[in-house]
UniProtKB/Swiss-Prot annotation:
Pfam families: F-box
Basic and acidic residues bias locations: 15-31
PANTHER family on file: BNACNNG10540D PROTEIN, F-BOX PROTEIN CPR30-LIKE
Alphabetical list of InterPro entries matching this protein: F-box-assoc_interact_dom (IPR017451), F-box-like_dom_sf (IPR036047), F-box_dom (IPR001810), SCF_F-box_component (IPR050796)
Domain F-box, residue spans: 33-79
Record's protein name: Putative F-box protein At2g02030
Bias-annotated ranges (Polar residues): 1-13
Spans annotated as Disordered: 1-31
C-alpha cells in the first residue's frame, strides 16, 4: 500500500460524503442566476401601472428607478386613466359607533365591480377637534376635502391615507375670530366684502385645471346682506386662499343643499334669484378653473321654472355634467 495521502477530493469520493459549496461560491452562483433574469423596463411599467395605490407606495422603496417612475406625472396620468376605466368606486364615511370616539371617522372604499385587486379597504382617521359634524366635498381624482366653518380644510386621498391641512380661508377666520379688526377682506380683490360672517349654501368644490393640470379648491357662499356670492380659490400647489371676482354673478345666489360638481374643467352650481330662492328660472353658474371666470347659463328645458335645489340633482357622469329633476310624480328626469 502506498504511503501517499489521498487528496480531499479522493477521500470524499471514497467516503461518499458531499460538502456544501463555500459561501463565496454560493453567492457567485446566485448572482449568475439573477443576472440571467432580465425584464425590460417597458414590461415593468406595464405591470406596475396595473397595481393598486398601496402597492405602488411600498414599491417606491425598491429602487431609485422605480421611485422616479412611480412618482412621475406621466405614470400618474396612466395609472389614473386605467383606474377610471375599471369602474366607479364608492366612499363610505361613518362615525366610530364601537368605541364612541368623538374624533374618529371610518372611511371605506368599495368598488362597484369586484375584482381580485379591488377589495374594499377600510381605514380609521382621527380628526383633532372633530365633534360629530364635518362637511365632505365631492371627489376629484380620489381627492376629498373634510372641513367646516371653524376648522382647517383637510385634503385627503383615502387610497394612500395621505392628507394635507390647509390654511384657514377668510370666511373661516371671520367665523372663528369675529370680532377681529385685523381680519378684513381686500376691497380691491373683493368688491363685495363680507361684513357679516353669516353665510349660507357654503360648500367646497374640488376640481382640476384642464390646461395646467393643477388641483383647485373653490369655496363659494352667499352672504348676508344679499350680494353676489363671494368666492375664494386655493391652488393646491400654492396653498393660499385668494378671492375671485364675482361681479358677473350680480342678482344671482347659489341655491341651498347643493354641492358644486366638477366636469369638463369647470365647477357648476345651481342659482336662483337675489335671495337664493328658486322663484325665477333656475340657472347654472359655471366657473372655468383655468381662466377663473364665471358665466351663467340656462338649464335644460325639462327643468321646472321654480324647481327648488333639493329637487334638482347635479353629478359627474363619465366626465360630463349630468342634471336631473325629481318631478311631482316621483319620476326622475335626466
Amino acid at each position: 500500500m502506498s504511503g501517499k495521502t489521498s487528496s480531499r477530493g479522493q477521500q470524499d469520493e471514497i467516503s461518499g460524503e458531499k460538502h456544501e459549496p463555500t459561501p463565496t461560491k454560493e453567492i457567485k452562483r446566485r448572482r449568475k442566476e439573477f443576472e440571467k433574469i432580465h425584464i425590460p423596463n417597458e414590461i415593468v411599467e406595464e405591470i406596475l401601472v396595473r397595481l393598486p395605490v398601496k402597492s405602488l407606495t411600498r414599491f417606491q422603496t425598491v429602487s431609485k428607478h422605480w421611485r422616479t417612475l412611480i412618482t412621475s406625472k406621466y405614470f400618474g396620468k396612466r395609472h389614473m386613466a386605467l383606474e377610471k376605466s375599471k369602474g366607479c368606486k364608492l366612499l363610505f364615511v361613518c362615525d366610530d359607533f364601537v368605541d364612541r370616539a368623538e374624533d374618529t371617522l371610518f372611511l371605506k372604499t368599495v368598488a362597484l365591480e369586484k375584482t381580485s385587486v379591488s377589495e374594499g379597504d377600510e381605514q380609521a382617521f382621527e380628526f383633532e377637534g372633530y365633534k360629530g359634524f364635518l362637511d365632505i366635498s365631492e371627489s376629484c381624482d380620489g381627492l376629498v376635502c373634510f372641513y367646516d366653518t371653524t376648522r382647517a380644510v383637510e385634503v385627503m386621498n383615502p387610497a394612500t391615507t395621505m392628507f394635507i391641512e390647509l390654511p384657514l380661508s377668510r370666511i373661516q377666520q371671520l367665523c372663528i375670530y369675529k370680532p377681529n379688526p385685523e381680519v378684513e377682506l381686500e376691497p380691491v380683490q373683493d368688491p363685495n366684502p363680507v361684513l357679516d360672517p353669516v353665510m349660507t349654501c357654503s360648500q367646497i368644490g374640488v376640481g382640476k385645471d384642464s390646461v395646467s393640470g393643477s388641483y383647485k379648491l373653490v369655496w363659494m357662499y352667499n352672504t348676508s346682506p344679499a350680494t353676489p356670492p363671494t368666492c375664494e380659490v386655493l391652488d393646491l400647489d400654492g396653498k393660499k386662499w385668494r378671492f375671485v371676482n364675482t361681479t358677473s354673478l350680480d342678482h344671482h345666489q347659489i341655491l341651498c343643499d347643493q354641492r358644486p360638481v366638477f366636469a369638463n374643467g369647470s365647477l357648476y352650481w345651481l342659482t336662483g334669484d337675489e335671495e337664493g330662492y328658486a322663484t325665477t328660472q333656475t340657472k347654472l353658474i359655471v366657473l372655468d378653473l383655468h381662466t377663473e371666470m364665471f358665466q351663467v347659463i340656462q338649464t335644460p328645458p325639462f327643468i321646472t321654472r321654480d324647481a327648488s335645489g333639493d329637487k334638482i340633482g347635479l353629478c359627474n357622469l363619465d366626465g360630463r355634467l349630468c342634471i336631473s329633476e325629481l318631478k311631482k310624480d316621483c319620476k326622475q328626469e335626466f
